Each structure stands twice: as C-alpha cells, then as structure tokens.
Amino acid sequence: MSTATFVDIIIAILLPPLGVFLRFGCGVEFWICLVLTLLGYIPGIIYAIYVLTK
C-alpha cells in the first residue's frame, strides 16, 4: 500500500465521497458513494474503502 492510498483511506473515513472523488472524479463510483453516505455514514465508508483498495 502506497502513501497516497493510505492518505486516500484516511480522507475516506472522514468524508467518504471526497476520498472517492479525489481518486475517480465525478464518475459512477463517486455517485454511489454519495448516495450510500446520505443513506448511512457507515455504508459510505465501507464502499469508499472498498473502491479505493481494489
């Protein structure tokens, strides 16, 4: 795991959509993460970490 990935994961824990946005831009991953975060903070975190580490 690189330092950039580690920083992305820390950002994803604090603000899940921001972490995904910084990596993928305004793509489908961002919108899925945003919806999951609005429905519940924990699902947004789980999805963000999953997407950032795959």
Swiss-Prot record:
Topology in membrane: Multi-pass membrane protein
GO terms under biological process: hyperosmotic salinity response; response to abscisic acid; response to cold
Induction data: By low temperature. Also promoted by abscisic acid (ABA) and dehydration but is not a general response to stress conditions.
Keyword Membrane: yes
Segments passing through the bilayer: 2-22, 32-52
Cell compartment(s), UniProt: Membrane
GO cellular component, as recorded: membrane
Record's keyword annotation contains Nucleotide-binding: no
Main location: membrane
Pfam families: Pmp3
Keyword terms, alphabetized: Membrane, Transmembrane, Transmembrane helix
Family of the protein in this entry: Belongs to the UPF0057 (PMP3) family.
Protein name as annotated: Hydrophobic protein RCI2A
